[in-house]
């Protein structure tokens, strides 16, 4: 048996230092219960010994399928102490994608935390759980022999999987140094004093690195928001925690700026990132909360969450057509190049290459690493695939993507991976996927497919179900459109500009539901809706539900609880729900009459 705990890595030594300096400070709040740094460290040491006893410390990777819970943080820190690279996996991950991830990791084991006791993602896996006494136990086949460690494995703190162009998710090897540099930059920006953070992002999303590691390595407190996305629950959590440092995806921030600005009253530093920040929403926040600093961040997972950022401190900072993505973090560097990798002049757009302390140590699949991590004379650079432009003051401005990568619900999606998954479905010969604007906050994916000649046509709902077994929810297209053949340009290439989602057939809606349907139509970008259909079949997301709930309540003058409408799935259910609470048609007409 091999033990790695006698020489813990840098990140864990930083955690130990915090525990020594402030043992009685609150480290974590979970379900209303505070845990001090001393208590947390004690549990981490116990978990480390449990991992060693089970033989897990001999393996370079520890896949964790977990909710946002205390046991997850304890295990994450224990892995860090032992030099094991932890891999966070969402419980909603489709089984085929889970197996693909584990195959890349070279292991057949999985640690389940905060899960139902009867959950078994796949019968071929060795599943570890905590019993009622907190003892780590396992079931299933024996562990595989540990795979050989790479020379730099000890420098990797976690692997985060992102969408891949080959149809297989890419594992990004995040380094200890990159994580610590992110922590140091944030600590300097928030002026060093202990703060209150909230962890609400998906554990498999790189934002979780910020939400968890920054507070735990700086002596701050992190409150765990355990439930699935629920705007009321997040609002309550942020307020109850007196959260003063918060990270939101840009799309979620835009939603909060429109409907829940009061949620951010106590926040002093708000980080946003993942998509283009709209000046109108930035200005609304800065007007409502003069004491807040809004940080517009930019960065791929391959460069550890944030590579550049731009701070806005007053409404005037947002009075511009485009908000910059700012300047490089300390010890992060980059250059803007043309197609031949030659640096361009100031004011000329080009592709951004990144290097420096935040740089990941390549991909888990070593064959993929040289396709994006370039060995240049001055060192290793990551090709972002992002067009940027730099002004004479050194400010960077995002200009768009070079390839077909898009952001859906804040997640990075490679169009090629979705198209590949579609062509693996029975009878599908060709597939083209495009992102279309759904409303002012969201994009959605539409798929256009051609079946092989003679193959039976499979219903859209069945195809959606099959895709859901292969892809995470945010990568499943909103709609699948059937074509006899794909349109071609004069050059014989697919004419993607002519592929537009068709309007649905008109619906005759009852008068009582016209207000609800009018609002949903605006959100989904579709004029005609079928009452009996699911809102999610039209591409609705959790953000869409928040928007609909807020707008309908605003029109009706109601304060209906979010958790009640979050359970509604069809348009008919929405109509019936609001018909029992108010007369939406009368209220809507009344409001329109006042304009």
From Swiss-Prot:
Name listed for the protein in its UniProt record: L-allo-isoleucine:holo-[CmaA peptidyl-carrier protein] ligase
One GO CC term on file: cytoplasm
EC numbers, comma separated: 6.2.1.46
GO biological process: amino acid activation for nonribosomal peptide biosynthetic process; response to microbial phytotoxin; secondary metabolite biosynthetic process
Gene from which this protein is expressed: CmaA
S-S pairs: none
Carrier domain span: 507-582
Free-text remark on how the cofactor is bound: Binds 1 phosphopantetheine covalently.
InterPro entries, A to Z: ACP-like_sf, AMP-bd_C, AMP-bd_C_sf, AMP-binding_CS, AMP-dep_synth/lig_dom, ANL_N_sf, PP-bd_ACP
Subunit structure of this chain's protein: Homodimer.
Function: Involved in the biosynthesis of the phytotoxin coronatine (COR) which mimics the plant hormone jasmonic acid isoleucine and promotes opening of stomata for bacterial entry, bacterial growth in the apoplast, systemic susceptibility, and disease symptoms. CmaA catalyzes the adenylation of L-allo-isoleucine (via the A domain) and the attachment of L-allo-isoleucine to the 4'-phosphopantetheine arm located within the T domain of CmaA. It can also use L-isoleucine, L-leucine and L-valine as substrates.
Keyword terms of this UniProt record: Ligase, Phosphopantetheine, Phosphoprotein, Plasmid, Virulence
Superkingdom per UniProt: Bacteria
Domain note: The didomain protein contains an adenylation domain (A domain) and a thiolation domain (T domain).
Residues the record lists as O-(pantetheine 4'-phosphoryl)serine modifications: 542
Protein family membership: Belongs to the ATP-dependent AMP-binding enzyme family.
Molecular function as annotated in GO: acid-thiol ligase activity; phosphopantetheine binding
Cofactor(s) this protein cannot do without: pantetheine 4'-phosphate
The organism's taxonomic lineage, starting at the top: Bacteria, Pseudomonadati, Pseudomonadota, Gammaproteobacteria, Pseudomonadales
Catalytic activity: L-alloisoleucine + holo-[CmaA peptidyl-carrier protein] + ATP = L-alloisoleucyl-[CmaA peptidyl-carrier protein] + AMP + diphosphate
């Amino acid at each position: 048996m091999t033990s790695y705990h006698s020489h813990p890595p840098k990140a864990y030594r930083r955690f130990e230092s915090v525990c020594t300096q402030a043992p009685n400070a609150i480290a974590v709040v979970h379900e209303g219960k505070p845990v001090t740094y001393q208590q947390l460290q004690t549990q981490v040491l116990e978990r480390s010994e449990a991992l060693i006893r089970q033989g897990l410390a001999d393996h370079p990777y520890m896949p964790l399928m977990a909710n946002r819970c205390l046991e997850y943080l304890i295990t994450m820190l224990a892995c860090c102490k032992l030099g094991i690279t932890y891999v966070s996996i969402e419980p909603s991950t489709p089984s085929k994608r889970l197996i693909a991830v584990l195959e890349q990791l070279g292991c057949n084991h999985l640690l389940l935390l905060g899960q139902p006791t009867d959950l078994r993602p796949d019968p071929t896996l060795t599943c570890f759980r905590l019993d009622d006494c907190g003892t780590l136990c396992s079931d299933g086949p024996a562990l595989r022999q540990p795979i050989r460690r790479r020379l730099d494995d000890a420098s990797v703190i976690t692997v985060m999987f992102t969408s891949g162009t080959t149809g297989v998710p890419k594992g990004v090897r995040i380094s200890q140094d990159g994580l610590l540099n992110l922590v140091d930059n944030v600590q300097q920006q928030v002026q060093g004093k202990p703060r209150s953070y909230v962890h609400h992002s998906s554990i498999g999303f790189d934002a979780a690195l910020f939400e968890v590691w920054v507070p735990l390595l700086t002596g701050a407190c992190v409150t765990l928001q355990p439930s699935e996305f629920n705007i009321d629950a997040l609002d309550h959590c942020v307020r109850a925690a007196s959260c003063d440092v918060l990270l939101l995806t840009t799309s979620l921030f835009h939603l909060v700026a429109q409907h829940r600005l009061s949620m951010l009253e106590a926040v002093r530093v708000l980080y946003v990132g993942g998509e283009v920040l709209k000046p109108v929403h930035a200005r609304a926040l800065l007007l409502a909360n003069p004491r807040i600093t809004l940080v517009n961040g930019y960065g791929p997972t391959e460069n550890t969450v944030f590579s550049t950022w731009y701070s806005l401190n007053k409404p005037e900072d947002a009075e511009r057509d485009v908000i910059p993505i700012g300047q490089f973090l300390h010890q992060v560097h980059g250059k803007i190049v043309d197609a031949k990798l030659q640096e361009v002049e100031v004011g000329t757009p080009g592709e951004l290459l990144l290097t420096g302390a935040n740089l990941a140590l390549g991909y888990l699949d070593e064959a993929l690493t040289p396709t994006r991590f370039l060995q240049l004379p001055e060192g290793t650079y990551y090709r972002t695939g992002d067009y940027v432009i730099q002004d004479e003051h050194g400010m960077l401005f995002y200009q768009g993507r070079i390839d077909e990568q898009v952001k859906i619900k804040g997640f990075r999606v490679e169009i090629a991976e979705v198209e590949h998954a579609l062509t693996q479905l029975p009878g599908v010969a060709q597939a083209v996927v495009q992102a279309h604007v759904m409303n002012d906050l969201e994009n959605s994916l539409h798929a256009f497919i051609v079946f092989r000649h003679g193959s039976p046509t499979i219903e859209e709902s069945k195809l959606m179900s099959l895709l859901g077994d292969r892809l995470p929810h945010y990568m499943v297209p909103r709609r699948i459109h059937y074509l006899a053949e794909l349109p071609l340009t004069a050059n014989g290439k697919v004419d993607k500009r002519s592929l537009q989602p068709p309007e649905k057939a008109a619906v005759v809606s009852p008068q009582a539901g016209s207000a609800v349907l009018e609002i949903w139509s605006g959100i989904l970008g579709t004029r005609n809706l079928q009452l009996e259909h699911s809102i999610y079949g039209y591409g609705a997301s959790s953000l869409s539900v928040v928007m609909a709930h807020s707008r309908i309540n605003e029109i009706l003058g109601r304060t209906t609880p979010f958790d009640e409408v979050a359970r509604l799935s069809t348009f008919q259910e929405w109509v019936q729900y609001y018909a029992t609470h108010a007369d939406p048609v009368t209220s809507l007409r009344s409001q329109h009459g006042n304009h």
